Swiss-Prot record:
GO MF term list: proton-transporting ATP synthase activity, rotational mechanism
Quaternary structure and interacting proteins, as annotated: F-type ATPases have 2 components, F(1) - the catalytic core - and F(0) - the membrane proton channel. F(1) has five subunits: alpha(3), beta(3), gamma(1), delta(1), epsilon(1). F(0) has three main subunits: a(1), b(2) and c(10-14). The alpha and beta chains form an alternating ring which encloses part of the gamma chain. F(1) is attached to F(0) by a central stalk formed by the gamma and epsilon chains, while a peripheral stalk is formed by the delta and b chains.
SUPFAM superfamilies cross-referenced by the UniProt entry: N-terminal domain of the delta subunit of the F1F0-ATP synthase (SSF47928)
Keyword list, A-Z: ATP synthesis, Cell membrane, CF(1), Hydrogen ion transport, Ion transport, Membrane, Transport
Chain ranges passing through the membrane: none
InterPro entries assigned: ATP_synth_OSCP/delta_N_sf, ATPase_OSCP/d_CS, ATPase_OSCP/dsu
Claim: Cell wall biogenesis/degradation is one of the keywords in the record: no
Origin species: Geobacillus kaustophilus (strain HTA426)
Protein name (Swiss-Prot/TrEMBL): ATP synthase subunit delta
Compartments in which it is found: Cell membrane
Length: 178
């Protein structure tokens, strides 16, 4: 089975527990902290895959390293360790945070532009396109792409809205050829 699908199942289960216990904010904070800790300490993942350490020793390491996180997050980490799927934690974190954003009506977007967009322009894009995709707000990352010449290309999930000059020129070219 695909690793992304497996991670999504664990993320969904953790998300449901967070909702049931009314701890969504706390668990979100903990998941972000775990993701960051693992990203900054690659040796920790290597240590957990070291074959000479027993499962109990590895569990003790997780309990000690993540003593400050909530019980549901710690239990999820221990379950992943027991099932030899601890490597899924970064993907699980991404999936969990996507579920949280979705529940809050937030979508992630990438705006490609020839120049940096102002906060006002980003806010205007968010206001217009959030409604189009049925969300309350968009969190937009601006990437500079001088090849666009002008205008903006916006990617939300797997949808692309191309309002760039280069995109318009390409559409005109296709019309003239076809």
């Amino acid at each position: 089975m695909n690793q992304e699908v497996i991670a999504k199942r664990y993320a969904s289960a953790l998300f449901q527990i967070a909702l049931e216990q009314g701890q969504l904010d706390r668990i979100e904070e903990d998941v972000r902290a775990v993701r960051q800790a693992l990203a900054e300490n690659g040796e920790f993942l290597s240590l957990l895959s070291y074959p000479k350490l027993s499962l109990d020793q590895k569990k003790a390491l997780i309990r000690e390293a993540f003593a400050g996180v909530s019980t549901p997050v710690q239990n999820t980490l221990l379950l992943l360790l027991e099932r030899h799927r601890f490597g899924l934690v970064p993907e699980l974190a991404e999936q969990f945070l996507a579920l949280v954003d979705d529940a809050r009506g937030i979508a992630k977007a990438v705006a490609y532009s020839a120049r940096p967009l102002t906060d006002e322009e980003l806010r205007a894009l968010s206001d217009v396109f959030a409604q189009k995709v049925g969300k309350q707000t968009l969190e937009i990352e601006n990437i500079i792409d001088p090849e666009l010449i002008g205008g903006v290309k916006l990617r939300i999930g797997n949808r692309i809205y191309d309002g760039s000059v280069s995109g318009q020129l390409e559409r005109i070219r296709r019309q003239l050829i076809g």
